[in-house]
Swiss-Prot record:
GO molecular function: ATP binding; ATP hydrolysis activity; RNA binding; RNA helicase activity
Location in the cell: Mitochondrion
Superkingdom as given in the UniProt entry: Eukaryota
Lineage: Eukaryota, Fungi, Dikarya, Ascomycota, Saccharomycotina
Protein name as catalogued: ATP-dependent RNA helicase MRH4, mitochondrial
GO cellular component, one term: mitochondrion
Motif Q motif, chain ranges: 151-158
Pfam families, alphabetized: DEAD, Helicase_C
Described purpose of this protein according to its UniProt entry: ATP-binding RNA helicase involved in mitochondrial RNA metabolism. Required for maintenance of mitochondrial DNA.
Gene encoding the protein: MRH4
Top-level EC class as recorded in UniProt: hydrolase
Residues that coordinate or bind ATP: A206, E207, T208, G209, S210, G211, K212, T213
Organelle transit peptide residues: 1-71
Catalyzed chemical reaction(s): ATP + H2O = ADP + phosphate + H(+)
Length: 603
């Protein structure tokens, strides 16, 4: 249990008064906004307390409209938030044209699509996908007594991506071939072949926690299965020869080994379920009755930390083709060091589908050279899918430079891109106020204490993620919370770039699965705390995390979006506490919570 060095009654009384003072002080903020020559007073802020009736401890909510409630696109010219989010170093997100991209992404029909059965997904992929999503569903609360009661519906990004990416290639067939000369027929055939083999480039951008992983997995897995089905229809011999061919068919590139492991585990789970094939179209029945299709039957491989590139060759030699390889760009470039293999990149010559996840990271200066060099080794590439939760301005510039013909880019963006889910409640805590008197760690300890006593997540281990800006801060904060505030060693860990990948995996395990029942936790923990940096702010699917704490503001709006997105995922509720002091306090921070509730876009 956490100790702050004060008796419980005294602590509760002090903190109640302190946080009430913080929230009350917000009412002194007002902002005048010029609208067509007239002045309009922004609404007064809302003030709340963080389950204080149950815990006896109040955590202040800084959701006032104040100086910065109008955040991002559409903010008034006179608002502080508009200046902060749309100019200067903090503002790094590209928002121009997003509404148009969402309109052209097929989302105008999203209200009519309520089931994956309405989307073009291969039958075995659809069933395995739904089973995998259900297996990771955070089943807490009274809504559902059993996972069988949960109906899995496609999210907006899944609808848009599947409708766009999984379209049949439109190839115009000339009607008057008989009337053409031999030369004209050859020209038409070449044009048709070029259209069939042309690389299509998709960008898929959607808010954090919206289901982007399955938005691209459903597409590439369906395409792989459709290709299998075509070989099967040719002849049994052709199909068996294809299965045993030593080739990699698709690749998923990610920036970190943690993300490689995460996507690999998702695919491994999907590949393990026995499939029942209800309501399968007649044309697929014979194909799906083959013994290898009792499960998804895909050959999956990963190259992560500790995995030698030579292992890929061994798997190809022993088991034939690899359907999906999950790795980092750096791992593929390391194939050039395989002196024992003649032409080591030849196994990638048959790759038809490539996903670049967290594309804004893999296209920044530190990764761009490796990423582009890797993709150049895929001469038969049909679909290149770039996936991201944010479109930073620099990423957009890189796309324009790499693909100057914008017609070659097929863009998919959801209406909520760069918006924070309304399921996330954002609260600000000012560490300069009494009783903290400038101590952000004491303010942090109080927030942890309040969360531990708030009565939520009944009978489950509560999990908290704390973000700091520098990796040098991680170990010091962990040590301080242990030594001064008596948090048990078993209940807290720190992860930064200096922690080896093996230890990271062990530390992350409690946060990457649904919350455990108190009685099942081997450490007898009531709370688990992870202290980290932006290393784990991107893409990590922290399942059912309800509480995130930011020790100050991140360095940019991009990092802010990703940190807030570690909670409130897949329509679940979450809370974020931002601890500020005079060094990091910005006038717009206290308005961030209400701006999120208004659906404002972060700029």
């Amino acid at each position: 249990m956490i100790s702050t060095g004060l008796p419980l009654f005294t602590l509760s009384k002090i903190c109640h008064n302190c946080f009430f003072k913080q929230t009350r002080s917000l009412s002194r903020y007002s902002s005048k906004d010029k609208v067509k020559g007239r002045r309009r007073l922004l609404p007064r802020p809302n003030t709340e307390k963080f389950n204080s009736a149950r815990s006896g401890v109040g955590v202040g909510v800084g959701n006032g409209a104040g100086a910065g409630a109008r955040v991002g696109v559409g903010a008034g010219a006179g608002s502080v938030a508009a200046k902060v989010f749309e100019s200067g170093n903090f503002s790094q997100l590209h928002n121009n044209g997003l509404s148009k991209q969402a309109q052209t992404a097929g989302l105008d029909l999203k209200q009519k699509i309520t089931s994956f059965d309405q989307l073009k997904v291969f039958p075995s992929v659809r069933e395995a996908m739904i089973k995998e999503i259900k297996s990771q569903y955070n089943l807490k609360g009274p809504q559902h007594s059993s996972i069988d009661d949960v109906v899995i519906k496609p999210t907006p990004v899944q609808i848009a991506a599947i409708r766009k990416i999984n379209q049949t290639r439109k190839i115009k067939v000339a009607k008057n071939l008989d009337e053409m000369s031999e030369g004209e027929r050859i020209q038409i055939e070449l044009q048709t072949k070029n259209e069939e083999q042309k690389t299509k480039i998709f960008t898929v951008a959607a808010e954090t926690g919206s289901g982007k992983t399955w938005a691209y997995l459903a597409n590439i897995m369906s395409k792989l299965k459709e290709d299998d089905y075509k070989w099967f229809n040719q002849s049994p011999e052709a199909y068996n020869s294809f299965k045993s061919s030593e080739q990699v068919r698709s690749v998923i590139l990610l920036p970190t080994h943690e993300l490689v492991e995460q996507v690999y585990e998702t695919l491994k789970r999907a590949n393990s379920f026995l499939l029942e094939y209800e309501n399968v179209p007649l044309q697929y029945k014979e194909f799906l009755n083959l013994p290898e299709h009792h499960t998804l039957g895909l050959s999956i491989a990963k190259l992560s930390h500790g995995d030698a590139p030579i292992n890929v060759y061994k798997q190809l030699r022993n088991r034939g083709k690899i359907d999906i390889l999950i790795t980092t760009p750096g791992k593929i470039t390391s194939f050039s060091k395989l002196e024992s293999i003649d032409r080591p990149f030849k196994i990638f010559k048959s790759i038809r589908y490539c996903v670049i996840d967290e594309a804004d990271t893999l296209f920044d200066d530190s990764f761009l050279k490796d990423t582009t060099a890797v993709v150049k080794n895929f001469p038969k590439l049909l679909d290149l899918i770039l996936v991201s939760a944010t479109i930073p301005k620099e990423f957009e510039k890189t796309l324009l430079r790499l693909f100057p013909d914008q017609k070659s880019l097929i863009r998919v963006a959801t209406p909520s891109l760069h918006k924070i889910s309304k399921n996330i409640k954002v609260m600000t805590l000012d560490a300069d106020l009494a009783p903290y008197n400038g101590s952000k760690t004491r303010c942090l300890a109080q927030a942890i204490y309040a969360i531990s006593k708030d009565g939520t997540e009944h009978n489950h281990v509560k999990r908290i993620i704390i973000f700091v800006n520098e990796k040098a801060e991680v170990d010091g904060l962990v040590d301080l919370l242990q030594s001064k505030y008596h948090i048990r060693r078993e209940d807290i860990c720190g992860i930064s770039g200096s922690v080896n990948v093996g230890d990271r995996k062990d530390y992350l395990e409690p946060f990457l699965k649904p919350a455990q029942l108190l009685e099942d936790d081997v450490d007898q923990s009531k709370i688990k705390i992870l202290v980290t940096t932006d290393l784990l702010a991107r893409g990590m699917n922290f399942i059912g995390i309800k509480n995130v704490i930011l020790m100050g503001l991140p360095k940019s709006s991009v990092e802010l979006v990703h940190r807030l997105g570690r909670t409130g995922r897949m329509n679940q509720l979450g809370r974020v506490f931002i601890i500020v002091d005079k060094k990091s306090r910005k006038s717009w921070v206290k308005g961030l919570g209400s701006a999120i509730m208004k659906g404002s876009r972060i700029g």
